[in-house]
Structure formats: C-alpha cells, structure tokens
Amino acid sequence: YTPDDWYRLIQDKYQQIRKTQADSTQNLGERVNDIAFWKECLFHREKAIAQLASDRTRRPNIELCRLVNEVYEVDETIQTLQQRLRDSEDTLQSLAHTKANTLYIDQEK
C-alpha cells in the first residue's frame, strides 16, 4: 500500500465509525422517546380504568358485569404496553452498551 492508500483507508474507517456513532445516537434517542411514550400510555390507561371503576360503582342499580370484561380487556392492553416498554428499555440498554463499547474502542485507537 502507498501512503495515499493508507490515508484513504483510514479516512474510510473514520467515516464508517462516525456514521455508526450517529446511527447509535439516533437509535438511543428513538428508544428514549419510545419509553416515554409507553410510560405515558400506561399512565393514561390506568387512569381511565380507575375512572371507569369509580363511575360504575357510584351509579346505583346498574350492573357491574360489563366492568369485569372491560377490566380484562384493559388489563391485556396494559400488559401489552408494559411488554413494549420492557422491549424498548432492553433495546435502549443494548444500544447504550454498544455505544459505550464503541467509545471505548475509539479511545484506544
């Protein structure tokens, strides 16, 4: 290899590393936003359930049997949202670990 070839190789690697870092940073930001979104969804769902239960129990002579089905449906939704939240947090943790490794490798070079 000539010095120019080495220089081009180093520049290419440098650009690849910068692109990977930018992608990692973007992915981290997206996962943080996902986590905030899923937490907000869970909060609003739980608040809605509490309000439904409160409204139903205060109305006299109205059967509460539909409430049981609604609670099961909402519970399934909450479990799904919690799973999505866990998935997003796991992805964020993985991306943060990858980013830390990338920065460590860059510092050694």
UniProtKB/Swiss-Prot annotation:
Keywords: Cell projection, Cilium, Cytoplasm, Cytoplasmic vesicle, Cytoskeleton, Flagellum, Membrane, Ubl conjugation
Subcellular location(s) of the protein: Cytoplasm, Cytoskeleton, Cilium axoneme; Cytoplasm, Cytoskeleton, Flagellum axoneme; Cytoplasmic vesicle, Secretory vesicle, Acrosome outer membrane
GO cellular-component term (any): axonemal A tubule inner sheath
Topology in membrane: Peripheral membrane protein
InterPro entries recorded: Tektin-like, Tektins
Taxonomic superkingdom: Eukaryota
Xref: Pfam families: Tektin
Lineage: Eukaryota, Metazoa, Chordata, Craniata, Vertebrata
UniProt similarity note: Belongs to the tektin family.
GO BP field: cilium assembly; flagellated sperm motility
PTM info: N- and O-glycosylated.
Subunit text: Microtubule inner protein component of sperm flagellar doublet microtubules. Interacts with TEKT1, TEKT2, TEKT4 and TEKT5. Interacts with CCDC38.
Annotated protein name in UniProt: Tektin-3
Described purpose of this protein according to its UniProt entry: Microtubule inner protein (MIP) part of the dynein-decorated doublet microtubules (DMTs) in cilia and flagellar axoneme. Forms filamentous polymers in the walls of ciliary and flagellar microtubules. Required for normal sperm mobility.
